[in-house]
């Protein structure tokens, strides 16, 4: 572990956070920022609006971290206790800052309001603290070193205000005061078609690396590997990451579909665009989810022509030319129907590729032979048509089945496009 004097700790203040009424997006933002600045960060604490418990949290944090970053509790109401509690912790008196009063009065005047007594509370800071201005609101923060080797930073809980104060004032201060001794450079590799456990088994030796480090993540069917290097410069970090990325890509093969801000839809779009090819989709159980993923990509109109949400069998027949006999014999959720849907939309819109999805998203509608979570994906292309079966299960619910099905359809198309190269 790094020297505690150069470690940061985030303390989020607010009973609403403890109750789960709001997400702690401030802590997430600050954690990512600290990582990018290369400042070690090992602990986070959430404390309600209670003076004694906040004092206890501060005393614990001050023994293990040299930079304590507080969000919340800077407002004008009685339960906003952060500033006065910190002053009490270090036995320092509060003093009113005239420049804060002037700033609040000006902001109130622009809104046609008059400064009230409770807002004067926001101008109280411990003697010796440096003002951390709030350009957007009335609650300023502070940067304060109550003792050698300890720095406190306070921010309001409003995310937009906190982020602006952090970026405009706190980050420059950290650079000027030698907190950013190295930077962290990261590369995120993205995988589809392999489970987290299977990928982890393949790349297990990489998890023992120290610089760069490799860590796995998984959500919504996608697996990610984050490669992170500590370095003196971005160029040095990139150089450390490059050979590790090359090895990981070689091991994973085509299960690795992209990196950083890539998505399955953006990768598929780039492949189609480069080949001058086009796509249409026919969806049943995803109800437009596949088309939505595609149309989030800027410029997708160059290669995506449109689609059909063929929920009812009559629509499958009239729009996609799925035969009534096939529907009667195999059922709407079947490989042959998925293939006929893909061919039907390909032919109707005249595109290079047609992709279809039909399945049972649940929670009802499943049978012993066709359970909830059963999905068929059809891919029609220049060299023919095929389908794949996936059984996602019912445990994670309807949205999970729909999200995975849309992602899998894009991945099957991606793999088909790569096979043409």
Swiss-Prot record:
Gene3D superfamilies given in the database record: 3.30.70.2860, CinA-like (3.90.950.20), MoaB/Mog-like domain (3.40.980.10)
InterPro entries, per the entry: CinA, CinA-like_C, CinA_C, CinA_KH, Competence-induced_CinA, MoaB/Mog-like_dom_sf, MoaB/Mog_dom
Q: Which domain of life is it from?
A: Bacteria
Q: Coiled-coil ranges per the record?
A: none
Q: Which Pfam families match?
A: CinA, CinA_KH, MoCF_biosynth
Which protein family is it in?
A: Belongs to the CinA family.
Cited NCBIfam families:
cinA_nterm, PncC_domain, PRK00549.1
- How is this protein named in the record? CinA-like protein
What does the organism's lineage look like at the top? Bacteria, Bacillati, Cyanobacteriota, Cyanophyceae, Synechococcales
């Amino acid at each position: 572990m790094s020297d505690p004097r150069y470690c940061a700790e985030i303390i989020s203040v607010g009973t609403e956070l403890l109750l789960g009424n709001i997400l702690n997006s401030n802590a997430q933002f600050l954690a990512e920022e600290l990582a990018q600045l290369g400042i070690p960060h090992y602990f986070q604490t959430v404390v309600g609006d209670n003076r004694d418990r906040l004092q206890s949290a501060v005393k614990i944090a001050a023994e293990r971290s040299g930079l304590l970053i507080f969000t919340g509790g800077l407002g004008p109401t009685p339960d906003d206790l952060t500033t006065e509690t910190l002053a009490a912790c270090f036995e320092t008196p509060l003093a009113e800052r005239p420049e804060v009063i002037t700033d609040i009065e000006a902001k109130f005047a622009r809104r046609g309001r008059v400064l009230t007594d409770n807002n004067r509370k926001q101008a109280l800071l411990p003697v010796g603290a440096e003002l951390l201005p709030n350009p957007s609101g009335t609650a300023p923060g502070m940067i304060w070193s109550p003792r050698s080797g300890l720095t406190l930073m306070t921010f309001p809980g409003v995310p937009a205000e906190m982020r602006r104060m952090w970026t405009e004032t706190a980050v420059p201060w950290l650079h000027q005061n030698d907190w950013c001794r190295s930077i962290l450079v990261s590369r995120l590799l993205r995988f589809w078609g392999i489970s987290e456990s299977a990928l982890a088994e393949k790349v297990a030796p990489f998890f023992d690396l120290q610089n760069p480090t490799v860590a796995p993540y998984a959500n919504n069917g996608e697996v990610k590997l984050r490669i992170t290097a500590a370095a003196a410069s971005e160029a040095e970090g990139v150089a450390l990451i490059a050979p590790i990325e090359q090895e990981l890509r070689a091991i994973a093969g085509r299960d690795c579909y992209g990196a950083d801000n890539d998505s399955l839809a953006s990768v598929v779009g780039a492949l189609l665009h480069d080949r001058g090819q086009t796509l249409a989709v026919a969806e049943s159980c995803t109800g437009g989810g596949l088309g939505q993923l595609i149309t989030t990509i800027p410029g997708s109109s160059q290669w995506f022509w449109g689609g059909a949400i063929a929920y009812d069998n009559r629509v499958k027949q009239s729009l996609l030319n799925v035969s009534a006999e096939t529907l009667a014999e195999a059922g709407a959720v079947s490989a042959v129907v998925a293939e006929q849907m893909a061919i039907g939309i390909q032919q109707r819109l005249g595109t290079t590729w047609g992709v279809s999805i039909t399945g049972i998203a649940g929670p009802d509608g499943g049978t012993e032979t066709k359970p909830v979570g059963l999905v068929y994906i059809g891919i029609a292309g220049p060299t023919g048509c095929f389908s794949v079966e996936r059984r996602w299960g019912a445990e994670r619910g309807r949205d999970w089945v729909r999200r995975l099905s849309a992602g899998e359809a894009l991945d099957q198309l991606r793999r088909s496009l790569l096979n043409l190269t």
